Amino acid sequence: MRVTQEFYELLRNRINISDVVRQKLALTRKSSNYVGLCPFHQEKTPSFTVSDSKRFFYCFGCKASGDVIKFTSNISGLSYNESAIKLANDYGIEIPKLTVKQKEFYEESDNILNILELANKFFRTQLTPEILNYLNQRNITETTIKEFSIGFSPRNNKFAKFFLDKKIDITTLGQAGLIGKRKNGEIYNLFSNRITIPIRNIYNKIVGFGARVLGNGLPKYLNSYETIVFQKNDTLYGEHKAISSSYKKNRSILVEGYFDVIALHQAGFSEVVASLGTSVTENHLHKLWRACDEIILCLDGDNAGIKASIRTINLALPLVNSEKKISFIRLPSGLDPDDVVNKNGADFFAKLIDKRISLSEMIWYIEYSGKNFKTAEEKANLEKNLKDYCNKISDSNLKASYYRFFKDQIWQNLVIKQKKIITQNFNSSLIASSHCYSELEMLEHAFCALLIKFPIMLAEKDIRDFILNLNFNNKSLEEFRNWYLNEIIDNKVEESEITAIVEKTSFFDIFLLLSKADNLFLDISFNKNNIRLDLLWQWLYKKYYLINLQQEYAISINGNHDFEKVLLYKKEILKIVNELQVLNESFINQTIT
């Protein structure tokens, strides 16, 4: 009795793999998984791991791995299909009968799979010394050639004759994606004069081929045409080998090319797959996330690789969360993974994995690295782009973390590290010449920015008195505060007239810096339209109080031995830090809901 692929997936989703495994061996809970003594080899220390969330088992000892159906097959000696039927009967799951169309589909699928196996056997027999020498120059060993079934499709008519002798016609070869048709109607061997690499699905069945031209012809790589058994948006090269390793290491490495997978696998990185030269799809990501929690993208270090990274980032952002992650390996410019591992060795590539950067760090690298942000327009565009990325994230907690991360990066890289903050169009003087700001000076700027951006807050006498009585470290800002309160706020100058008045004073540069639409000194959130002023004031006030507390604490621990006083300072500091954290969460949650 034949069942559909959809029914296999139904069984994986409906039946907890741990329930099935527990019938054959004792399992002990370990974190989110279960462990026990492997039923497939003798061992004294449990190395057999089962994960209900990933619907997978893996033995660290004998390397046995698979889903609930594969476990049943291995235990019982039944085929995969027979094991699925057994599980369905055991758990009372109805097995749907195949429709006439489904039967025809599976008959055609089986026929295509058989033809592809025959084609691979033919290609394997056509390896010549020239081809083997080429592969050897690429550091591909004889063992690897056999393991990946690398072959060759000659230019002559041997390919067509091979299938004609087996009574397989041109139409059937076309259904298998093995031949092409020219504009003039001529039929030709799709992979003529190319090295062939079989593409296998997760069940180790050949579903298509990739092929590389000998020499410098174009296109360099070809894939089989899509068929009923082969869709590029759902298939990953190397997935049949990588899934168990991905489960073991809790990561998958996603590259672009066949030879990237082969070279990395040969170097010991068996958790590697490739996207068949096409853009990464949502199906690809979900397939890998079922086996692991982290997908590491390792794309070429050129402009095309960066563009591919951006496409994948935009695809992944709505899907990622605190558990399912994307990270990136940044390769040396102009090199692909195959080049890197062959020129620098496995240890070098392992270090690149260790130095991988997170998705948020990759976004910052793409948007910030190698660019100038001298003008307000450039900075505003950067903030807009970062905000657009954040808004694509579905997970609210992760979105909040991204907002915080980018805010911090903007502050660290566009304020503290910049020697000039105001654009070159203005004759910056007092502020722009400073090399960096202390935390206290940052707050002094923020208090002055309040006067400009939220003058309504000064209706609160306590707030006005606090700002008015502050002793600024930056005396230029203090003078600006006094002048602005007296000349603008107290005189109730209309907003439309303020710029013209300030322009005639020595405070114009300061005013320009503080009055920008997205002022960094008040950039607790990216969106100021619905800002809660009470939260903003509490945050600024408590931050100012904390900095002064920390300064007094530093003096107390260095200047005397009043331990009771020191402990009081420490307790108060921790209290304010916690209160600020709560305010941070409130602020960000407000902006993203």
UniProtKB/Swiss-Prot annotation:
Coiled coil region boundaries: none
GO CC, alphabetical: cytoplasm; DNA-directed RNA polymerase complex; primosome complex
Lineage: superkingdom: Bacteria
Zinc finger (CHC2-type): 38-62
GO term, biological process aspect, one: DNA replication, synthesis of primer
EC number: 2.7.7.101
Cofactor comment text: Binds 1 zinc ion per monomer. Binds two Mg(2+) per subunit.
One term of GO molecular function: DNA-directed RNA polymerase activity
KW Membrane (keyword) present: no
Keywords assigned by UniProt, alphabetized: DNA replication, DNA-binding, DNA-directed RNA polymerase, Magnesium, Metal-binding, Nucleotidyltransferase, Primosome, Transcription, Transferase, Zinc, Zinc-finger
UniProt-listed PROSITE patterns: TOPRIM
Function text: RNA polymerase that catalyzes the synthesis of short RNA molecules used as primers for DNA polymerase during DNA replication.
Domain remarks: Contains an N-terminal zinc-binding domain, a central core domain that contains the primase activity, and a C-terminal DnaB-binding domain.
Protein name: DNA primase
Origin species: Rickettsia typhi (strain ATCC VR-144 / Wilmington)
Phylogenetic classification of the source organism: Bacteria, Pseudomonadati, Pseudomonadota, Alphaproteobacteria, Rickettsiales
